[in-house]
């Protein structure tokens, strides 16, 4: 073969090799392109990297907030005397004869009152040194120091709306409020409201002399309740009403109590008759028509010395009142039965049984048996009243 032909063959061989290399490069590029396009069309769930997976949010479980508030209430506390009474047998003299001083009056019930969350009473006296009396049959007073007896007795609030708060006119009224404020005892009634938080729950305490059913008074009562309900408060009203020595409420008491509950009140507590009256359940709320006397300096030896401590255990779920527990603790206004020593004392044995039996007889609209154990009323239940 000529040198010329050999060169041509060698050249053709180089061309063929180059063409083959070009072909291989094209095939490789095509495969890479196909793989890239295929990867771009993968579904999201084909990505197996769990770190990039967005999981749905799980809401934390919300626990209900449950709260209980224990309220105690007692009746007429006339911590004073009338100047016409025999001083030797009077309430002030009794404490002076004891080593307990001002702690004497509530020493036999303090074990109960100190274990609740709040205790209220009807304060039916004045704390004043004024001698300018109102023109009436009885005028009760004690010096301002006697307000200490309330604090020592674990009483946090008092109703001052009654027929003895002005026994020594406006001066006596103002002196009484000043004495209470000095001892940090809250008061309500006669234009004052007591609003407070107890264990985070809102409470409003109101007091009135409840002998009137005229429109002006009812409108005022309705407005006072409405203002408290705007703050989701439990509304507790004290009414000084009824007839003395009457064991059953008169029609006006029932009408006023029902009106108050119809407009949002939760518990109604009554006093003035100086004896106990029945308890009523109305629209899943509670009315105690008369708590009777308690620490009562208005009589050195009343024939009926029975009384009781009214207690209500209020249960809340998420700041809403869901049930009202009711019980009574039978007491006597005196630690002895032959006179009034002005020292309320728990009853036991037959005396306790007899008081509970009598109170149930008087409470024909209670809807449950009243005892010293709590009975709970569901406030959210549809009422049949």
Residues covered by each model-derived region:
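Acidic, metal/ion-coordinating pockets
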Residues: 2-3, 19-23, 31-385
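N-terminal Lys/Arg-rich, disordered targeting/topogenic segments
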Residues: 1-17
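Electropositive, gly/pro-rich neighborhoods at or near active sites that engage anionic ligands
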Residues: 26
């Amino acid at each position: 073969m000529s040198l010329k032909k050999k060169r041509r063959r060698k050249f053709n061989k180089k061309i063929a090799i180059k063409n083959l290399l070009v072909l291989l490069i094209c095939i490789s590029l095509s495969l890479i392109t196909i793989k890239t396009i295929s990867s771009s069309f993968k579904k999201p769930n084909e990505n197996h990297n769990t770190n990039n997976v967005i999981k749905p949010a799980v809401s934390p479980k919300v626990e209900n907030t449950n709260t209980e508030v224990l309220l105690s209430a007692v009746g007429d506390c006339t911590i004073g005397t009338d100047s016409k009474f025999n001083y030797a047998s009077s309430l002030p003299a009794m404490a002076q004869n004891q080593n307990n001083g001002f702690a004497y009056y509530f020493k036999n019930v303090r074990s109960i009152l100190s274990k609740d969350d709040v205790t209220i009473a009807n304060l039916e006296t004045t704390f004043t040194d004024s001698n300018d009396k109102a023109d009436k049959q009885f005028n009760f007073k004690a010096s301002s120091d006697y307000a200490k007896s309330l604090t020592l007795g674990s009483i946090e609030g008092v109703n001052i709306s009654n027929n003895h708060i002005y026994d020594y006119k406006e001066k006596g009224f103002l002196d009484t409020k000043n004495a209470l404020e000095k001892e940090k005892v809250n008061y309500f009634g006669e234009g004052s409201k007591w609003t407070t938080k107890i264990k985070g729950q809102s409470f409003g305490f109101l007091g009135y002399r409840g002998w009137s059913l005229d429109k002006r008074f009812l409108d005022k009562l309705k407005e006072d309740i409405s203002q408290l309900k705007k703050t989701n408060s439990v509304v507790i009203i004290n009414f000084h009403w009824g007839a003395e020595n009457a064991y059953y409420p008169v029609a006006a008491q029932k009408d006023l109590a029902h009106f108050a509950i119809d407009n949002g009140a939760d518990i109604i507590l009554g006093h003035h008759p100086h004896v106990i009256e029945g308890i009523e359940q109305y629209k899943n709320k509670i009315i105690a028509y008369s708590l009777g006397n308690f620490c009562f300096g208005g009589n050195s030896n009343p024939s009926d010395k029975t009384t009781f401590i009214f207690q209500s255990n209020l249960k809340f779920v998420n700041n809403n009142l869901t049930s009202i527990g009711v019980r009574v603790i039978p007491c006597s206004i005196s630690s002895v039965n032959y006179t009034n020593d002005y020292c309320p004392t728990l009853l036991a044995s037959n005396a306790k049984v007899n008081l509970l039996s009598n109170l149930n007889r008087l409470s024909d609209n209670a809807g449950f048996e009243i005892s010293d154990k709590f009975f709970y009323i569901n406030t959210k239940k549809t009422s049949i009243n």
